[in-house]
């Protein structure tokens, strides 16, 4: 004879259950497996910087030309700082990097804006990859990069 639902004994969730539940609710780390974080970051940073510079060279709009130049300059500075802080945390160097990096050449402003939104989403989800206490320095630099991208998206709305 089956026990009624009311009489079933409740079992406290285990750590495994809690971590699985937590994992389902939060977006996954965009950097992939932890052993590949640095390699994936370098690839993404280089692709982003190259995409901004290619758009800078190809645009016919003077305001977009100036805005992308400023964005590239700020991103380059913040990316350099981010990677130096990251590498300084464990006194490591980059090894076994991919030899090929995609060159993303946006066809028009709409495509480029979409790409910038994708980069922004990548950085927003990056907080799932780092510990908010131990890696607050990296997350602060990430926030500066997000501010640069958001300011640039605003500047694209100007004529």
List each model region and its residues.
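Arg/Lys-rich, intrinsically disordered low-complexity tails that mediate electrostatic binding
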Residues: 1-36
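Disorder-to-helix initiation segments
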Residues: 30-42, 48, 108-112
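Non-transmembrane amphipathic alpha-helical segments
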Residues: 45, 52, 82, 123-126, ...
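Helix-loop segments that flank and shape redox-cofactor active sites
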Residues: 47-70, 129-136
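Hydrophobic core segments within long, regular secondary-structure runs in both alpha-
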Residues: 49, 76-79, 120, 146
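Conserved alpha-helical segments that form or flank metal/cofactor-binding pockets of metalloenzymes
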Residues: 63-95
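Amphipathic alpha-helical coiled-coil segments
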Residues: 81-86, 152-159
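Acidic/histidine-rich alpha-helical segments that form the ligand environment
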Residues: 101-156
């Amino acid at each position: 004879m089956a026990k009624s639902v009311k009489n079933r004994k409740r079992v406290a969730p285990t750590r495994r259950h809690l971590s699985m539940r937590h994992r389902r609710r939060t977006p996954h780390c965009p950097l992939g497996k932890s052993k590949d974080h640095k390699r994936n970051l370098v690839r993404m940073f280089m692709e982003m910087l190259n995409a901004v510079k290619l758009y800078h060279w190809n645009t016919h709009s003077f305001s977009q030309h100036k805005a992308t130049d400023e964005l590239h300059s700020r991103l380059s500075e913040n990316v350099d700082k981010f990677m130096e802080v990251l590498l300084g945390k464990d006194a490591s160097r980059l090894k076994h990097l991919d030899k090929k990096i995609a060159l993303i050449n946006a066809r028009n402003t709409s495509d480029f804006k979409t790409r910038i939104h994708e980069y922004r989403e990548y950085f927003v989800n990056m907080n799932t990859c780092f510990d908010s206490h131990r890696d607050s320095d990296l997350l602060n630099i990430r926030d500066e990069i997000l501010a640069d991208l958001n300011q640039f998206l605003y500047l694209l709305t100007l004529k």
